[in-house]
C-alpha cells in the first residue's frame, strides 16, 4: 500500500538507524526519508528551503535526543509511536480517498499531526505548514 520509492527510503533510514544502534526510528527519521523523494524535494525547493540545512538539523536532533543501545546488546529498533501514527494515518487517509497507495506527500501532510515533534517545529521554523503541503499536492495533481 506504500509506494515503492517511499518504502525504500523508509527502509534506508531504518537500516541507518539500526547501524547507529538507535533504539527508535522517529518522526525526524521519516522526514529525512521524505527529503530523498523527488516530489517532496520539488515542493520544498519551490518554497526556497535549504534542504541540506534542514537535513543537518534533523540529524543533529536525532544524534542528541535518540537513545542508543549499549555495545553488548543486539539492537532491535522500534518505530516511535509518532512514526507509527503517521504511517497509519497516511494509510487510512489514502484508503478513505479510495487511493491504491500512499505516497510521500501524503506522509508529509500526516507529519503535521505530530505537533510535539521536532520535525514539525523545524518545518514551522522554515514557514512550511500543513496547508502549504496540501496546496502543493493540489498543484502537483493539477500539473499531471
Model-derived features: positions:
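Histone-fold recognition with a strong bias for associated Lys/Arg-rich disordered tails
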Residues: 1-144
Amino acid at each position: 500500500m506504500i509506494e515503492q520509492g517511499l518504502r525504500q527510503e523508509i527502509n534506508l533510514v531504518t537500516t541507518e538507524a539500526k547501524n547507529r544502534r538507535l533504539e527508535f526510528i522517529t518522526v525526524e527519521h521519516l522526514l529525512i526519508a521524505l527529503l530523498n523523494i523527488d516530489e517532496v524535494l520539488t515542493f520544498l525547493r519551490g518554497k526556497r528551503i535549504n534542504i541540506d540545512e534542514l537535513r543537518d538539523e534533523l540529524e543533529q536532533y536525532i544524534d542528541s535526543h535518540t537513545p542508543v543501545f549499549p555495545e553488548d546488546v543486539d539492537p532491535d529498533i522500534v518505530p516511535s509511536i509518532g512514526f507509527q501514527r503517521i504511517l497509519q494515518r497516511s494509510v487510512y487517509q489514502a484508503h478513505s480517498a479510495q487511493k491504491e497507495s500512499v505516497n510521500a506527500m501524503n506522509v508529509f501532510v500526516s507529519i503535521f499531526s505530530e505537533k510535539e515533534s521536532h520535525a514539525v517545529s523545524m518545518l514551522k521554523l522554515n514557514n512550511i505548514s500543513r496547508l502549504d503541503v496540501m496546496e502543493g499536492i493540489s498543484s502537483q495533481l493539477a500539473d499531471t
